């Protein structure tokens, strides 16, 4: 496949060239490349090519194939799915049914990342991560309270997360990272207190990174005043001050990765109190991130690529995440001038006007999604 007249970033440098894909890799990037016999040519004039996103915090409640198609539409090529047997990234759930999993066997079967949903068996899990050189993702089970503690929770009469205790378990993993020198990614980080603790432990030699949900950078808890079930997200949204602080932290590189936190709403309850927790957002991931983070000048386009794919690829030691020769051809082609509106009524972003739209997704050199009438073939 030959991508003609592609605009893309090579590190921090904006370039324009042709990109040749073959046998799952990017094999050549040059100006004015000529197609070979029977080579598919995709015209990228006025479009932008960037590495497909990698999402490390996805819950599957809808069937894996359906989930993948939604992800491709949102520019997400690789998924780390917590529940179920299918995941684009082969993960090892350290604890199942309150028992320690057979981590050694699962690693030998191709496990790429170790996930800890609680601090049970902490010592054993940590030593497995160290011994097998596995990156450790800490994604603690949610308390499933609708709001964070504060004035709004009291005003609305909703159950709330007591913020006084939100970091007590995380600190144990922070110390393990420092003591054993294990790379650890802390998932669903959404408070400045947690980020300050991460910095303090990293200053002592820990290898910690933070991953934050897109929703918590774009929305704040004032949306709960409408009692709409689509805003019932776990963990709950922060107040405006907390949201702005997260955006500043992202701008200052204190947040390494972002996630859609996608989880389907598995109920049709109309009442906020009775509705299921969830965040149906992956099918608009690129457009949401580009609109509210890049267009709003929270971060640059280059930094968006770092927090949505480059840092994830490095954490997982994948040969992907950048538009470079000899990297995996995991790419998306986007129209940055296209305007769309979120149509999924279960999405927390429903009705919002967005900029930027995925036209084509390519994984290992093969097209997995193409928008109708997009990316003309030459």
From Swiss-Prot:
InterPro entries hit by this protein: Amidohydro-rel (IPR006680), DHOase/Allantoinase_Hydrolase (IPR050138), Metal-dep_hydrolase_composite (IPR011059), Metal_Hydrolase (IPR032466)
Keyword Lipoprotein included in the entry's annotation: no
GO terms for MF: allantoinase activity
A GO biological process held by the record: pyrimidine nucleotide biosynthetic process
Tagged with keyword Secreted: no
Keywords: Pyrimidine biosynthesis
GO CC annotation, single: cytoplasm
Alphabetized Gene3D superfamilies for the sequence: Metal-dependent hydrolases, Urease, subunit C, domain 1
Top-level taxonomic group: Bacteria
Matching SUPFAM superfamilies: Composite domain of metallo-dependent hydrolases, Metallo-dependent hydrolases
PANTHER family, per database record: ALLANTOINASE
Role according to the record: Non-functional DHOase.
Family membership noted in the UniProt record: Belongs to the metallo-dependent hydrolases superfamily. DHOase family. PyrC' subfamily.
Protein name: Probable dihydroorotase-like protein
